[in-house]
């Protein structure tokens, strides 16, 4: 049996994929639990925001989450299958018609709100 290089890579990566991830869509408001080591202690820091971009790609699947902290927009890119991501919880579904919501960077205040979507389960 001969396998090409991509099939070999996919079979090795499949062992490290997380199965317990919820379905995440662009526009959703999510809470990500990030493992942080401070001193000798390890704790989980919650990061809550709106998903403005998603990249599919097996083990290198990423989401970009944006939130406003003390009046400043903060964006963070998370590798979904990373061991640093302890948990992901979808808080509300957003109704959007774009794959990438980069236009939210230019908007301020109430203009950044996204309509809630009720036809998808949490």
Swiss-Prot record:
Pfam families associated with the record: Ribosomal_L19
Entry's Gene Ontology cellular component terms: cytosolic large ribosomal subunit
Transmembrane residue ranges: none
GO function terms (MF aspect): structural constituent of ribosome
UniProt-listed InterPro entries: Ribosomal_bL19, Ribosomal_bL19_CS, Ribosomal_bL19_sf, Translation_prot_SH3-like_sf
Annotated SUPFAM superfamilies: Translation proteins SH3-like domain
Entry keyword DNA-binding: no
Any one of the GO BP annotations: translation
Alphabetical keyword list: Ribonucleoprotein, Ribosomal protein
PANTHER family: LARGE RIBOSOMAL SUBUNIT PROTEIN BL19M (PTHR15680:SF9), RIBOSOMAL PROTEIN L19 (PTHR15680)
Cross-referenced HAMAP family: Ribosomal_bL19
Main function: This protein is located at the 30S-50S ribosomal subunit interface and may play a role in the structure and function of the aminoacyl-tRNA binding site.
Stored NCBIfam families: rplS_bact (TIGR01024)
Family: Belongs to the bacterial ribosomal protein bL19 family.
Protein name, UniProt field: Large ribosomal subunit protein bL19
Organism lineage: Bacteria, Bacillati, Cyanobacteriota, Cyanophyceae, Synechococcales
Gene field: rplS
């Amino acid at each position: 049996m001969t396998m090409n290089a991509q099939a070999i890579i996919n079979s090795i990566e499949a062992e490290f994929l997380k199965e317990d991830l919820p379905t995440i869509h662009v526009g959703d408001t999510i809470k990500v639990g990030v493992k942080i080591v401070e001193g000798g202690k390890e704790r989980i820091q919650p990061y809550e925001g709106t998903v403005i971009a998603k990249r599919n790609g097996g083990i290198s699947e990423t989401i970009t989450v944006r939130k406003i902290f003390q009046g400043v927009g903060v964006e963070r890119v998370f590798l979904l299958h990373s061991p640093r991501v302890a948990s992901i919880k979808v808080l509300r579904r957003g109704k959007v018609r774009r794959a990438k919501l980069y236009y939210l960077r230019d908007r301020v205040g109430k203009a950044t709100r996204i309509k809630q979507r009720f036809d998808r389960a949490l």
